[in-house]
Structures are given as structure tokens and as C-alpha cells.
Amino acid sequence: MKMPSINVVFKEKGISAIARSARGIVLLILKEDTLPSQTEVNLYTADDIPKELSDSNREQLELTLRGYVNSPKKVIAEIISKDAEDYTDILKTIENKRFDYLVIPDIEENHIDTIATWIKGMRTNKNKRIKAILPDCTADTEGVINFVNKVIRTRTKTYTTAQYCGRIAGVIAGTPMTIACTYAPLPEVIGCDVWTQEEMDTMTNAGKLFFFFDGEKVKLGRGINSLVTTVQGKGVSFQKIKLVDLMDMSTTISARRHRTITLASIRIAMRIAACW
């Protein structure tokens, strides 16, 4: 799979067209020296960002909320202590929360694979259709988006790969279901890595998501996740962020409907039993 040409057509057998646009939910795990009064905050606009957070964490939330065509449906901030040795406790906390994309801007390199493994387990064993945007993570799974830019410069700041994962999550979450995030522009970025066309094709084939300068603007390459190894029942369609989002949405809606029907059936059965 190479970088896309100008005319891109996305097709997937078995997925019906979704007429309405949808926005995803991004959950960020943020570290603070001093825990605020609220350690979980739901944000819909930049006005909702708590002033008591550090400047760097406030910036992370603002970056995520920028989105793309739309802003994300919601951004959830989970605040943990900077002294936390790992993410075991917070992963237990968020396991049953409803969100689509996980981001940890301050993630240490030795924890990246742990988060990728957790995402795989949630998707495979618990049918929780969540995904993570992780820096330099060759997880080889549709649940992990492997963001790899090393040079990220705006007019005011230079960012690490991990620090810009929230911005990428916001772009993906703010992409309507009618289009893909491929070629989504990042107008604030004025400097980024430089690659040849062949290098970008190789990176795309390796399941790496990146942005590049096309001579006029900085924009995302092909909207893909880290899945490289395809098997029967999980083909190249599972490598595309948009199609996985559509499939995950379908699975989630079906599961919710099943739970609703099951609960209704239980209530009816209880009423009948009460009459006996």
C-alpha cells in the first residue's frame, strides 16, 4: 500500500453507508505535580479547560479540541499524579468508560508497549472498540495508530512525537464519517520531517502515520493504523483508520442494542414470573 493519489475512493464490502457525520471521544491521561480538585473532567470546548491545570496540560487539551472538520464530540481528561510509577490504576478506572481514542502525552518509552497490549486485550477479550494513538509503536494491530513524526515545529514551540499524539487524535475524532483523515491539513505546523516519495511509501507500508509538507502545506499522509500483518478475515481494509472506525461503530451499536433487548427481555420475564 502506497501513499494515496489525488483521487481516493474508499470501499468496504459489508459496511453500509452512514449518512450522518459522527465525532469521536478522546481520552487523555495527564500527569500533574499536584492533583486538582477534580481528577476527571469532560470538555467540549476550550472554555471547559480547568485553569488549575499546568500550562502544558492545558495546551494538550486545547490541541486535542482543535479537531479537523469538526471538533471531537468530547475530550475526557483523566488526571493522575506525576509520581505514579505506571498506568495500572488509571487503566482500571477507564476500562468501562465510553471513549474512542486514548492518548498519553507524557508516556515514557518503557510504557508504550504496555498500553498497546492493553488496547489489544480490550478489543479482543472484552469487545471494547477503543484505539490508542502512540508514538513510534509498531504494534501491528488495528487498535493502535503508530504516529512517527520526529520534527514538529509551530511558530511558538517544538513538540515531541508523544506531545503531538493528542493533536492527531483530535484530527481523527473530528473527521466526519463521510470522509477520511487522509490529507487533513495541520496549518499550525511550519516545520516537519522531510522524506522522499519512496520513503513515505515504505513508511505507509510499515503502518506508520505521519504528516509531510507537500510544497504548499503540511498534511497527513494516508490515514492508516499500525496493522501490517493481514490474515483471512482481517485484510487490508483493517489497516485504514476510517474503515476500522466504521466497523467499530457498527460493533458498538450492535452490542448496545443487544444489551437493550436483553434487559427488556429480562424485565418482561420478571413481570410474567411475578404473575405466576
Where are these regions (language model features)?
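A glycine- and small-residue-enriched flexible loop/hinge signal that marks low-structured segments
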Residues: 92-276
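Small-residue-rich
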Residues: 1-149
